[in-house]
Structures are given as structure tokens and as C-alpha cells.
């Protein structure tokens, strides 16, 4: 049982890996022998976090705005050109927006849905070949989407697009879990909060 959760030698990509939950996940991976790529829209912050985590193992910074499909394509190319496998994808990058109901702006929906839902779907789609080839029946690849309790219940804050986006992530996770299981890819979500 001592190797029940052994992840040494795996390769992971953690989006939004420069701070918060993403940084904690990346740190856990690096400290347990996982070659870990992290992304963030903020280049300097991403580079500094990768440098900090590299004290414990291998951590590579790939600054990326996942709402920009050209940048996403560059990220995918970077992974595919440098790795033979990608065992774990953590979709953690996210955005929130708060404003009163009567003045909640359209761009508050666009930014949040583009980051929290659309980018997750398209990143999985673009990485599907390497994820599929990295898994097998006994050790599938893993995709973990970071949802939120705000996507399950009613939040106190006036963040209308955020809970809607997290509810969408929970549902997208169920759909993808069903569709990708036969391709040796497990898809799950967690709901922090």
C-alpha cells in the first residue's frame, strides 16, 4: 500500500499554477517527483513560481493567456515538442467578476466564461492526443477540473457569471468523463470552497 498514490515520474500541466490552489497543487506534484508545467497570464509571476518550485524538483513556466487560442496553441506545441507523455492535466486557471445585478456588465460574463469554461474545453481538445497516448487501462491519464461550491449552491457575493461558469464546469466534467473513459482518460472535478 505504500505506493498507492505514487506519481513519481509522471508529467503534469497545471493551469493557473503560479498562485493559490494551482501553486499548491504544482508544489505537491513537484515534491513528489512529477515534472510539472505551470501556466499563468502573468509572465513574471509564473516564472518566479517555477523558479521557486524548482528547488524541489522539475517545474517549467509556460506563461499563457488561455483565452487567446494562439497562445493556447503555443502552449500545446511546447508540451508536445518537449514531452512524450502528459499524464495529468489540472484545469485550475480561472476568473471571477463581481458587480451588482443591475449593473453587471457583458464583459463580466465574457471574461469569466471564456476563462473558466471555454478555455478548459479547448485545452482538453487540443491535448487529447498526448493525454490519450499517455494512459492505458491500468493507469489512465487524469484530467481534474477545478470547480467550486459556488457552482453547486448559491453564493453570497454578486458574482453571477462565476457560479454559472463553475456549474458549467461540473456538468462538462460529467460529460467528458463519460466520453473519454474509453480513451483511457479519467475526468473529475473538485469543488473547493
Q: Model-found features: residue ranges?
A:
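The beta1-alpha1 cofactor-binding region of Rossmann-like NAD(H)/NADP(H)-dependent oxidoreductases
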Residues: 43-44, 63-74, 106
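Substrate-binding pocket helix/loop in short-chain dehydrogenase/reductase
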Residues: 100-101, 105-113
Amino acid at each position: 500500500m505504500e505506493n498507492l498514490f505514487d506519481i513519481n515520474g509522471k508529467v503534469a500541466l497545471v493551469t493557473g499554477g503560479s498562485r493559490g490552489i494551482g501553486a499548491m497543487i504544482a508544489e505537491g506534484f513537484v515534491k513528489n517527483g512529477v515534472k510539472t508545467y505551470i501556466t499563468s497570464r502573468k509572465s513574471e509571476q509564473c516564472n518566479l513560481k517555477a523558479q521557486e518550485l524548482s528547488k524541489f524538483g522539475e517545474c517549467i513556466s509556460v506563461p499563457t493567456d488561455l483565452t487567446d487560442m494562439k497562445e493556447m496553441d503555443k502552449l500545446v506545441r511546447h508540451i508536445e515538442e518537449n514531452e512524450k507523455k502528459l499524464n495529468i492535466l489540472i484545469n485550475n486557471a480561472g476568473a471571477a467578476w463581481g458587480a451588482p445585478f443591475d449593473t453587471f456588465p457583458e464583459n463580466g460574463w465574457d471574461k469569466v466564461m471564456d476563462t473558466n469554461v471555454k478555455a478548459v474545453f479547448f485545452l482538453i481538445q487540443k491535448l487529447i492526443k498526448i493525454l490519450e497516448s499517455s494512459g492505458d487501462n491500468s493507469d489512465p491519464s487524469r484530467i481534474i477540473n477545478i470547480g467550486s461550491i459556488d457552482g453547486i449552491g448559491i453564493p453570497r457575493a454578486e458574482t453571477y457569471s462565476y457560479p454559472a461558469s463553475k456549474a458549467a464546469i461540473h456538468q462538462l466534467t460529467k460529460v467528458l468523463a463519460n466520453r473519454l473513459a474509453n480513451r483511457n482518460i479519467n475526468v473529475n472535478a473538485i469543488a473547493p470552497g
